């Protein structure tokens, strides 16, 4: 029998060229680059060498004002126990070259704002990757009496959307200095928490926004001392679901439920500023 490959359609996703159907502004380009950097870091953390990182080989989904990126073309990829710094650098070099070429192609088609420097934007990939990779994997040394810095490091990673499942903590021979390094880092901190509390499957930034709204709902309804799961249930029934119910049926398939709710929160904020 001939082999076949069965693929799964990624709903609500778009190739980057569809996002550039109209003139694209600098801030939107930056958000695309940020999403691609997060994807590349996540792949490298699990030992996946992409081999051909580019905007063309990526799909994007809207994520509460940002984008979430997904690997599409993996025919050049290799899954290994751990990537060397040389392999990671090779992926980054390919990404920089490919993205610069893709942005220049968009400029030639007058689909990119003149203020966007294709070369400089592509170079930012390496800078942003190094910054995120360092935050997720680097050693940090501090005095043995400053153990509160362990919690602060974990909180910083949570803010970036990553859970820390394991830490490597070493104390020097003199017992005065502690060295800390995250060992097992999992993306999706906020989306996992939202799913646990509400059963709603959302992108990371959508989940972050909805959890903030859940906290605001808890304060507004004087439920801050109640069990978190109970408050979350009331928030879903009193806030989230009523918003989705009023969306016309013919428009419900345009965006995911969490993205619709984010748009409503944005609109509510703009109205409050007037």
PLM features: residue spans?
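Short, well-ordered loop/turn elements at secondary-structure boundaries
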Residues: 37, 45, 65-66, 266
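Fold-independent oxyanion-binding glycine-rich loops
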Residues: 10, 74-75, 138
């Amino acid at each position: 029998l001939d082999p076949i490959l069965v693929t799964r359609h990624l709903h609500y996703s778009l190739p980057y060229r569809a996002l550039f159907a109209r003139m694209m502004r600098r801030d939107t380009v930056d958000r695309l680059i940020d999403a691609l950097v997060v994807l590349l870091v996540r792949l490298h953390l699990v030992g996946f060498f992409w081999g051909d990182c580019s905007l063309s080989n990526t799909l994007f989904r809207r994520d509460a004002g940002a984008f979430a990126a997904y690997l599409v073309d993996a025919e050049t990829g290799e899954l290994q126990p751990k990537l060397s710094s040389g392999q990671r650098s090779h992926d980054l070099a390919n990404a920089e070259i490919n993205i610069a070429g893709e942005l220049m192609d968009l400029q030639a088609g007058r689909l990119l704002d003149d203020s966007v420097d294709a070369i400089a934007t592509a170079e930012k990939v390496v800078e942003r990757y190094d910054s995120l990779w360092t935050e997720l994997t680097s050693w940090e040394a501090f005095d043995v009496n400053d153990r509160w810095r362990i919690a602060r490091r974990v909180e910083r990673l949570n803010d970036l959307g990553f859970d820390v499942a394991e830490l490597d903590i070493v104390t020097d021979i003199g017992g005065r200095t502690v060295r800390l390094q995250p060992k097992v880092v999992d993306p999706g901190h906020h989306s996992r928490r939202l799913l646990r509390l509400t059963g709603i499957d959302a992108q990371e930034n959508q989940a972050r926004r909805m959890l903030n709204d859940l906290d605001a709902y808890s304060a507004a309804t004087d439920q801050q001392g109640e069990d978190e799961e109970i408050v979350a249930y009331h928030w879903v029934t009193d806030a989230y679901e009523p918003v989705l119910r009023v969306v016309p049926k013919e428009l419900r398939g345009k965006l995911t439920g969490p993205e619709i709710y984010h748009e409503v929160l944005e609109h509510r904020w703009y109205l409050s500023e007037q």
